[in-house]
A protein has these predicted regions:
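Bacterial N-terminal signal peptides
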Residues: 8-19
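Glycine- and acidic-residue-biased ligand/ion/polar-headgroup-sensing regions
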Residues: 97-109, 114
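Conserved short histidine dyad/triad with adjacent acidic residue
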Residues: 63-68, 80-95
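Positively charged n-region of N-terminal signal peptides that target proteins for export
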Residues: 1-4
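Short acidic-glycine-tyrosine-enriched beta hairpin
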Residues: 115-131
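A short, N-terminal "cap"/entry segment at the start of jelly-roll beta-barrel domains
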Residues: 21-76, 164-194
Length: 194
């Protein structure tokens, strides 16, 4: 009898307690637009290189926002895809205000995550809790296609500031412009250890 009451109580909690979203989530959900996107659909952008960088210091390839505040209206997460050409690297960085998940669809990468370094392959999932240093280098023979998710917005604003829409001419950033963008978005990403 006691277990039957417990099961009923748990079910009632799940149905009544968890089914009700906090008012902020309800408001966000009302403003968000459901999306169904194919691989090539989304907001395509290209990173701007830093002026004076050598060609082999190239930034990662193009990326595409799929879901964020500007695409679908989500105010609680960022979901995007990015290509990492052979030899390219996502520099060592951390995100103070958000967890990050990266899923590598293919290829081979060397990952420095926190205090660990490991070689990973297509199908690997990387989880970087907020404030965890991460660096990803494509050490394979093919372009890596990756997917990343942030648990909170912020880094997407930095990415837009350091990139241009996919078909727009790419003009390098000066070192001063890059420094100003990084300072403005320090709440979202830090590229240099203190």
């Amino acid at each position: 009898m006691r277990s039957a009451i417990s099961v009923v109580g748990v079910c009632a909690f799940l149905v009544c307690g968890c089914a009700v979203l906090p008012s902020s989530l309800q408001a966000q959900s009302a403003k968000a637009t459901p999306l169904i996107l194919e691989k090539n659909e989304g907001e395509r952008r290209v990173w701007r290189p830093i002026e004076g960088a050598k060609i082999w210091d190239a930034v990662p390839g193009p990326f595409m926002f799929k879901v964020d505040r500007h695409n679908g209206g989500s105010s609680h997460l960022v979901f995007a895809t990015e290509d990492l050409p052979r030899g390219a690297k996502i520099d060592r960085h951390k995100h103070p205000g958000a967890d990050e998940i990266i899923f590598l669809q293919n290829g081979t990468a060397r990952v420095n995550l926190g205090s660990r370094t490991r070689e990973v392959h297509g199908g690997a999932t990387l989880f970087a809790p907020a404030n965890t240093w991460i660096e990803v280098t494509n050490i394979g023979a093919e372009t890596i296609h990756g997917v990343f998710v942030f648990s909170a917005p912020g880094f997407d604003d930095f990415m837009r500031a350091e990139s241009v829409p996919g078909r727009q001419k790419v003009v390098p950033l000066t070192k001063a412009e890059d420094a100003a963008i990084q300072a403005k978005h320090a709440h979202a990403v830090i590229y240099k250890e203190p």
